[in-house]
Structure formats: C-alpha cells, structure tokens
C-alpha cells in the first residue's frame, strides 16, 4: 500500500469504537488482561510489564449517541468524560479488565468514582501525581504510588512483576517514544511531508495496538514519509494549544491545514512523547519512572512545574518551533485549558505573537465558521505581522 492508502486504512481502525484490535488480542490471549488508560498521561509501562495490554481510552469521538451516561454524570462537562462512560455502559469496553484515571481535573477525578460504582467487576485505579515538584519528597511519593499500582496489577494478573520486567517495558516504550518524537521532528522541520492529520492517525493507532507492533509499524513507515515528493507551500507555522485531553475531530485538523496552516507543534496525544529524554535503564525502575515524571516531562497544562512557570515553558515551545502564531483550540467545559488560556494569551500579547481561539466538542460537525476564522488569521499573519 502507498502511504496515503495506509493512512486511510488506519483511520478506519481508530474510528471504530468497538475496539476491534482489543477484541482480536483478547481472543488470541484469553487469559491475559486489558487495561484502559484515560488521558493525559498514565504509566503504560506497568501493565505492559505485567504481560497486559495497555490501551488508550480517549472517548468516542462523536461516533455514538449519549443515551445512558447523562443519568450518571453531569451534561455540562467535557465530551470525553461523557462518551467514555457511554462506551462502558454500552459494553463496548467489556473486554477491559481495568481502567486508569489520573488527577488531571475535577471531571477525571469524579469519573474514576463513577466508574467504580458502575463497573465493580473492573479494577479502577486513580493515580495521584505529585503536585509540588520542588519538594524533595516528590519522587518518593510518586514511587510509592507506582508501587501500589504494581501490587494491584500483580493481584489482577497472578504474576510477579520483577525489576527485569519493568526495565524491559521501559526500554520498549523508550523506543516507541523515540519514534513518535521522530514524527514530530519531521512535522516541524518539513511540515509539507507530514500533515498533523496524518501524524495524528499514526499516533492514535498506537493507542490501540501492542507497543511492539506500533514501533515496528513506525519503523517501516517513517522512511516512506521521507521519500514523499511534496512541494513546500507558503503556509503559516502555527502551534495548537489546549487539546491535550479530549481529542478534536479529525476534520477540524484538516480544516486548519487546508486554510493555510502548517501545524508544526501541538499538545495532542501527549503521552506518546511525554518524556523529553529516555527514562534511565539503570537502578530502580520505579524510581526512574518517578524521577523522569518530575524532571523529564514535557510541558502540559495538567502538570505542575517547579523551577519554570507555564509561561516560560509555553514561550520556549513557540521559539523552538519557529511558530508564527498560536491557535488556542480547547474543548468545551475544559477548565485546565480555558484557565491557562487567560494567562498564556496575555503573554502572547506582551510578546506581540499572533493568536486566535475557538472551542470544539466531539460531536462537532460544521466547520465552515472556523475555516473562515483561520483563513482570516492566516491572512493577518502573512500580510500584517
């Protein structure tokens, strides 16, 4: 298949909310477990080390109607929480044995409790990330949290998780993150060779496959990207900010790119490249994961920082990406993204950097208004910056 044909095929997989890859894996490994991982970041290495399949659960992307979830969760929260719960209530996640949620926002916190109530047969973990990164006890605190997860996975699987298992999983995911970062390097240096629409499909596919299979796929497809014969265009280099949890419709990314933008950086699917450097493979593996979360994590609105403010990290991203403008693209009702917007847009105004903002939701189907806004934004950057 050509690169374009592969992208079309992979899109059919990520659009299928029945999780066909999970069902196939479960049929082939009936005695093994599947763990659902809610965004933004969860330690995929732990269930992998237990011989389980960690799978990203990122909502339904507008592919299903919300018929049951609104009786159990507020209707005025983000789409991803409601549609994820709907996936569970309609038994589309029946082959999942556990779910991981994290302390990223009030909605995610509440969703973990709602999940425990409605799915008592599943192991439900609520992960507490450290909040004060300057505290010397932070690595110890988070390592204890990881140890608790390991102990519960051992009970679920009936398998002892050794340090060797953990180190091998860290090594495996280090390689996958390296390949995902390579996609982003291509997207930034030569955006005409790889659109964000295409890169997103390749990364999203990885949330539905065993990590080894995804890494092999990327190793085969990256050379194809370099060989594409595509002419650079006079597009504006933009960065998307605010889409770190609920996933924007793929059509929205197409509209932005068709309007004259190269999306050279974004915060989509951050877990695929969460660490700026490989997690160390020497010493205690749980300490390495904990220490890496504190010292090697990528900038995100859902993570607290120690020595650098969010404004500093944000401006560093703009500078390194040679960005002409920023698109604040946030889900409706997403408090972390919308609260950060106020602070970050003030900083952009001080730095005289162009920006625009709009909101989206999973079931969004009309994009003409956003297309016109982005086209106007592109013209203002090209002719008046």
Model segments located where?
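A charged, amphipathic alpha-helical module
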Residues: 1-33, 143, 147, 151-278, ...
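Acidic/His-rich segments in extracytoplasmic proteins that coordinate ligands and/or metal ions
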Residues: 83-155
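A short, acidic, amphipathic alpha-helical segment used as a generic capping/interface helix at domain edges
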Residues: 88, 305-322, 339-340
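Peripheral docking tails and interdomain loops at the edges
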Residues: 6, 342-385
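Redox- and metal-dependent alpha/beta enzyme cores, enriched for Fe-S-associated oxidoreductases
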Residues: 29, 40-41, 46-58, 243-306, ...
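Acidic/glycine-enriched edge-of-secondary-structure segments
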Residues: 2-6, 62-80, 98, 203-212, ...
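An N-terminal, globular interaction/scaffold subdomain
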Residues: 38-89, 97, 112
């Amino acid at each position: 298949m050509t690169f374009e044909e592969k992208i079309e095929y992979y899109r059919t997989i990520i659009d299928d909310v029945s999780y066909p890859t999970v069902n196939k894996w479960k049929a082939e490994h009936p005695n093994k477990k599947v763990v659902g991982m809610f965004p933004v970041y969860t330690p995929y290495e732990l269930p992998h080390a237990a011989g389980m399949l960690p799978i990203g659960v990122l909502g339904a992307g507008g592919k299903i109607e919300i018929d049951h979830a609104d009786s159990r969760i507020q209707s005025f929260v983000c789409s991803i929480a409601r549609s994820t719960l709907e996936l569970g209530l309609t038994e589309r996640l029946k082959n999942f044995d556990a779910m991981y949620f994290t302390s990223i926002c009030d909605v995610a916190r509440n969703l973990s409790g709602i999940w425990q109530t409605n799915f008592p047969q599943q192991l439900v973990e609520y992960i507490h990330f450290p909040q004060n990164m300057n505290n010397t006890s932070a690595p110890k605190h988070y390592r204890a949290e990881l140890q608790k997860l390991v102990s519960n996975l051992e009970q679920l699987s009936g398998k002892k998780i050794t340090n060797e298992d953990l180190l091998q999983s860290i090594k495996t995911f280090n390689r996958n993150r390296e390949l995902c970062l390579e996609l982003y390097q291509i997207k930034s240096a030569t955006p005409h060779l790889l659109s964000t629409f295409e890169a997103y499909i390749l990364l999203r596919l990885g949330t539905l496959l065993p990590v080894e299979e995804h890494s092999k796929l990327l190793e085969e497809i990256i050379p194809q990207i370099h060989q594409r014969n595509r002419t650079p265009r006079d597009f504006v280099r933009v960065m998307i900010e605010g889409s770190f949890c609920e996933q924007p419709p793929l059509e929205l990314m197409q509209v932005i790119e068709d309007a004259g933008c190269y999306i050279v950086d974004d915060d989509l699917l951050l877990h695929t490249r969460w660490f700026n450097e490989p997690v160390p493979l020497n010493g205690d593996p749980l300490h390495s994961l904990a220490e890496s979360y504190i010292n090697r994590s990528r900038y995100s609105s859902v993570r607290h920082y120690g020595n650098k403010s969010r404004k500093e990290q944000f401006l560093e991203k703009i500078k390194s990406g040679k960005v002409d403008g920023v698109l604040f693209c946030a889900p409706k009702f997403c408090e972390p993204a919308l609260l950060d917007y106020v602070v970050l847009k003030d900083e952009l105004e001080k730095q005289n950097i162009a920006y625009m903002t709009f909101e989206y939701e999973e079931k969004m189907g009309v994009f003409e208004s956003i297309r016109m806004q982005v086209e106007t934004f592109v013209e203002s950057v090209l002719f008046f910056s």
